[in-house]
Curated annotation (Swiss-Prot):
This is Protopolybiakinin-1. Residues 1-11 have a biased composition (Basic residues). One of its GO terms (molecular function) is toxin activity. One of its GO terms (cellular component) is extracellular region. The keyword Secreted applies.
Length: 21
């Protein structure tokens, strides 16, 4: 879906953490 795009929060992505907005 277009609403489910992996975005980088604060420009950094913690290991094993995938932010889906």
């Amino acid at each position: 879906d277009k609403n489910k795009k992996p975005i980088r929060v604060g420009g950094r992505r913690p290991p094993g953490f995938t932010p889906f907005r």
